[in-house]
């Protein structure tokens, strides 16, 4: 069980995200992380650590941020380490994941992903597949990736060249989207 969130807006994104993750911490307190898209460079920076959201808050800087995603983790695949904490980043793709990808070992073998993975999680496999299929069209990459995944999941995804857009998809696992004006 994990807590995931995505946010884009005009508020102080970092504080909104970290405050929301503290509310979601009951869903997982083994590790926490956020990915933030810098307003000037559009580069996605990942901050993550084994431990609580309060530990994460201490390592995050306060640049102006366009959009972000965040995660609290209850470890299911892989130990409680900084490397296994979310978000996971592969190429232009950054994501957070809740659920279980049952066929992640087969996908690692089928797509020869072992050399590029940095964690022991099923989640990073989804990031690697998305990056594999990403050719400039996020929806097409998501569609192709999801067709390969078996299990229950919710994903919140950032693409580096889509500065103020957040994508989300789910299979069985719940996800809520809100638009505030």
Summary of predicted features, one role per range:
Residues 1-181:
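Conserved short alpha-helical segments that host acidic/polar catalytic motifs at enzyme active sites
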């Amino acid at each position: 069980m994990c807590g995931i969130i995505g946010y884009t807006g005009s508020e102080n994104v970092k504080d909104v995200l970290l405050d929301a993750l503290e509310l979601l911490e009951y869903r997982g307190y083994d590790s926490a992380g956020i990915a933030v898209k810098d307003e000037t460079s559009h580069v996605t920076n990942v901050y993550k650590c084994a431990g609580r959201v309060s530990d994460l808050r201490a390592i995050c800087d306060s640049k102006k941020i366009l959009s972000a995603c965040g995660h609290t983790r209850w470890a299911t695949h892989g130990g409680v380490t900084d490397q296994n904490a979310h978000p996971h980043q592969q190429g232009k793709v950054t994501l957070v994941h809740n659920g279980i990808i049952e066929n992640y070992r087969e996908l690692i073998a089928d797509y020869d992903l072992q050399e590029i993975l940095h964690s022991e999680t099923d989640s990073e496999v989804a990031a690697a597949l998305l990056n594999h299929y990403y050719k400039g069209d996020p929806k097409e990459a998501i569609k192709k990736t999801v067709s390969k995944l078996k299990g229950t999941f919710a994903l919140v995804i950032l693409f580096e060249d889509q500065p103020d857009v957040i994508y989300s998809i789910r299979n069985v696992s719940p996800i809520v989207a809100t638009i505030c004006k």
